[in-house]
Amino acid sequence: MTDTTLTELLERNARHTDSLPADHFADVQDGQEPAVVSMTCSDSRVPQEGMWYVEAPGWLFTPSTIGNQVWDRQDGEQIVDGSVLYPLVETGTEVAAVVGHTGCGAVTAALE
């Protein structure tokens, strides 16, 4: 990461935090109970909060992987990825959405 990129990242974060009201995280300060876990591709063109019109923290649990994969392997067994399983088991989330996108290079590579 270049110094310019790091500076821009920090400036963007400062603008973001400065734009929030002081009580923005008050409702989720003591824990989270998201309604939905949404697994998408980690592609930078797939912004989850915008896709689901999320206006406040706490409603959407947002993991992402290359190619929106929800499986992992442990001891030779196929299991649900922990970033999807955690909200379903530990936070009471009842809905899981797996979202792909047009032109996904990971999916294309897997199919070829």
Predicted regions and their residues:
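Short HxH-centered metal-ligating active-site micro-motif
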Residues: 58-112
